[in-house]
Amino acid sequence: MYTFVVRQENSSVYAEVSRLLLATGYWKRLRRDNPRFNLMLGGRNRLPFGRLGHEPGLAQLVNYYRGADKLCRKASLVKLVKTSPELSESCSWFPESYVIHPTNLKTPVAPAQNGIQLPVSNSRTDEREFFLASYNRKKEDGEGNVWIAKSSAGAKGEGILISSEASELLDFIDNQGQVHVIQKYLEHPLLLEPGHRKFDIRSWVLVDHQYNIYLYREGVLRTASEPYHVDNFQDKTCHLTNHCIQKEYSKNYGKYEEGNEMFFEEFNQYLTSALNITLENSILLQIKHIIRSCLMSVEPAISTKHLPYQSFQLLGFDFMVDEELKVWLIEVNGAPACAQKLYAELCQGIVDIAISSVFPPPDTEQVPQQPAAFMKL
């Protein structure tokens, strides 16, 4: 009998995983504060990583990788792309981005070289001067100069401003309470017809305890309800495909797709009929390359191969596609939700790939086969 604890009660994904484990008959759920467990299904914040793996004779597995925030926080992802040797020279799939600290965040900077302590001010990682230089250069060259400011830890479309005015973007950030990223806005996205609408793509990725990378074969397009207009920054519903924004602000929510979601089979049919291309060859090849590049760049920092406990993690990679069919990584979610119709298959894959490979069913010596719903990258 294996045992597990649940320390994240509000995760629909891990609620389903918990249900699947109990249904096997060889997993038992313990009280959340019991230290002698095989598996912890916890929240990604404040996990007790330092206390894991120290129970004598007990293998322990947790559903997050310590340090995965290098990918999953927007500012950290920008820094990773710029500083990682694997990414900095060859990364053409991430929009031009800058980390900006509000001026009201009082963070000491490093001492000057002459030993004089500089006054308390912006963090030393602030990149607003680099942003302004790029902004002014684009303005002089007559290039598209629309940018988007996003809170590093924001979600559900909160803490976002789209503008072509640098001063407006910086003033917006300076009145916030946390770090933001200013990112070049994708002004010419591939649009869906009918409706001339934006979309983004969510792909789910599972990393197991041996750092094998699995891509869930199904993905979902989150679609806008209103026609896209690059110069109308006030209408969030034509720019931001987040479900919360679409559902709350658009009278056309659900008009084109149920729940503003289009799945890969329908998207492939659309690409074939409208553009005479396939999803696999035009878009998925790029998605796979980006996912693998990101995860391999952080492996040395987050792998648990030499630690007394083991980890796995489900990640949500969000992409956009421009009118030239180039795929761009927008962000990585460390605790992704899942489309309702996909829960059963996705969560069964988590059990089979990430959990049963460490704690195999007691009535067989064979490790379960990789579910067909996932592909190993």
Swiss-Prot record:
One GO biological process term: regulation of axon extension
Enzyme Commission designation: 6.3.2.25
UniProt catalytic activity: C-terminal L-alpha-aminoacyl-L-glutamyl-L-glutamyl-[tubulin] + L-tyrosine + ATP = C-terminal L-alpha-aminoacyl-L-glutamyl-L-glutamyl-L-tyrosyl-[tubulin] + ADP + phosphate + H(+)
Keywords for the protein's UniProt record, in alphabetical order: ATP-binding, Ligase, Magnesium, Nucleotide-binding, Potassium
Needed co-factor(s): Mg(2+); K(+)
GO cellular component terms, A-Z: spindle microtubule
Pfam families recorded: TTL
Gene3D superfamilies in alphabetical order: 3.40.50.11480, ATP-grasp fold, B domain
The keyword ATP-binding belongs to this UniProt entry's keyword annotation: yes
Keyword Nucleotide-binding recorded: yes
Ranges where the TTL domain occurs: 3-370
Entry GO MF terms: ATP binding; tubulin-tyrosine ligase activity
Assembly information from the UniProt record: Monomer.
UniProt similarity note: Belongs to the tubulin--tyrosine ligase family.
Entry-linked PANTHER family: TUBULIN--TYROSINE LIGASE
Record's function text: Catalyzes the post-translational addition of a tyrosine to the C-terminal end of detyrosinated alpha-tubulin.
Name of the protein this chain belongs to: Tubulin--tyrosine ligase
Source organism (scientific name): Rattus norvegicus
